[in-house]
Amino acid sequence: MAAQRHIDINSTQVWAKLHQHQRATRHMHMRELFELDPQRFQRFSLELDGLLLDYSKNRVTERTLELLFDLARKADLRGWMDRMRSGERINVSENRSVLHTALRLPAGARLDLEGHNVAADVHQVLARLKDFSEQVREGRWLGFAGQPIRDVVNLGIGGSDLGPLVAADALAAYAHPDLKVHFVSNVDGQHLARTLERLNPATTLFIVASKSFTTPETLLNAQAARAWFLQAAGEAQIAKHFVAVSTNEPAVRAFGIDPQHMFGFWDWVGGRYSVWSAIGLPVMLSIGYDNFRAFLDGGHAMDRHFFESPFDANMPVLLALIGIWYNTFYRAHTHAIMPYDHGLRRLPAHIQQLDMESNGKRVGRLGEALDFDTGPVIWGEEGANSQHAFFQLLHQGTRLVPCDFILPLNSHYPLGNQHDVLVANCLAQTEALMRGKNEAEVMRELSHLSGEQLDMLLPQKLFPGNQPSNTLALDRVTPYSMGMLMALYEHKVFVQGVIWGINSFDQWGVEYGKQLARRILPELSGDTGALGHDSSTNGLIRHYRERHGK
């Protein structure tokens, strides 16, 4: 287990200095910062392999960043980065290494974990995935009727669903033209039923993605999919239409899946970081092995940038520290993600899971209570639509909401000047949120009004501005740039967890509700005695029974 390196970060001198700095600068307006420094964009932006980070539209000065870098050093961020990279067991509550970065290593790389080269294991699994995916994509993998596969249904939940779904959606321009990939996660039966009603059992392949092969939601969907399939074929045909991403060979075999078609991964890969592993099989089936390798290469490029760059030229570190500035010192509490790309519309949900499951913690690594704000609420929506939904609150509401704008500069689907319109809207929003509109500017607009009408309308049209944002501009959404983008947010979340003193790699909060659900399930059918819950839960159980005649 990793040595316990404990620092009461909120008792440090730099923590106090950051609070003092926030109080001294909280009324500073970004409009003034830009007016005083015409080179602000050049000084507060950086680029890596076609990915530009503009963090100039933030309530930060060079002094702010100096203090935040001091905070990172005080938290021993570089040490924690090195410990993660080398395979030390930094997931202390589960006594595990955290090595999703190893999944992105190039061929021939070496990473020894307790005397064993895990990079070689990774590439052995990749080779098997490559062989299988090429059989399916080239029409050589045939179903029970001798036809090639036309639809792939991924059955998973959490990290076994959302990461692959986001990557496959974003990279639809690279998808096989005759192979559709579907994702089913919800235990609500309509999710699976509405997917299957459009499919042909003879040309459908199911991926059951569950490391333990015991995840209740996934197994319920897998059993339902199996029953649907058996209406058209015999049990002997299951092996042609079901594969598993799992490490539980006996359970996989009992289901009817050939263990030769079981693809494993390791306990040092957390679910929300697993798209880079065999969990990414649906992505590989969609875009092909070479493109999937480019996706891994993009992630690896961000890894190298993260581990090797100084803090002041390090995208994940900068995003993380600026996020801490708002969340912990401004107590902003939320952070919005707006991708201006339809293919990235589910990216906010992925980042939401990644961030909130990792850093939604009230205790530190040693179990000590934390008396400062940690993980923010992450939310968002694709950009153009969100402008007509919640941007009103961003512009004229009472809350500070830091935002990330994600903008591909080129589209795979150019229609007239529509992409120019999209880009113009994105850039306009970042400027409007920063600048606002002051009284003099509104008065010029309303120069034709006077008296009560002017007095009434003037305050309605004021925009305070000073709402912070980062802009991440990609040349184009490609497998490589998507890999960089997803790895960027992984590392950002890790940095924030280190500074807050959190173990970002467990998720005990997910378990309690599952325990209670197992208790409540038999009570819904009336097969138990007295209910032992609070009056609300007991009342809801009885209400359900009444509606179902139980």
From Swiss-Prot:
Residues 527-550 are annotated as: Disordered. One of its GO terms (cellular component) is cytosol. SUPFAM superfamilies: SIS domain. It catalyses: alpha-D-glucose 6-phosphate = beta-D-fructose 6-phosphate. The active site is at E357, H388, K514. CDD domains: SIS_PGI_1, SIS_PGI_2. Signal peptide: none annotated. It is found in: Cytoplasm. Keywords: Cytoplasm, Gluconeogenesis, Glycolysis, Isomerase. One of its GO terms (molecular function) is monosaccharide binding. The keyword Transport does not apply. Its EC number is 5.3.1.9. GO terms for biological process: gluconeogenesis; glucose 6-phosphate metabolic process; glycolytic process. Pathway: Carbohydrate biosynthesis; gluconeogenesis; Carbohydrate degradation; glycolysis; D-glyceraldehyde 3-phosphate and glycerone phosphate from D-glucose: step 2/4. Gene3D superfamilies: 1.10.1390.10, Glucose-6-phosphate isomerase like protein, domain 1 (3.40.50.10490). NCBIfam families: PRK00179.1. Catalyzes the reversible isomerization of glucose-6-phosphate to fructose-6-phosphate. Belongs to the GPI family. This is Glucose-6-phosphate isomerase 2. It comes from Chromobacterium violaceum (strain ATCC 12472 / DSM 30191 / JCM 1249 / CCUG 213 / NBRC 12614 / NCIMB 9131 / NCTC 9757 / MK). The gene is pgi2.
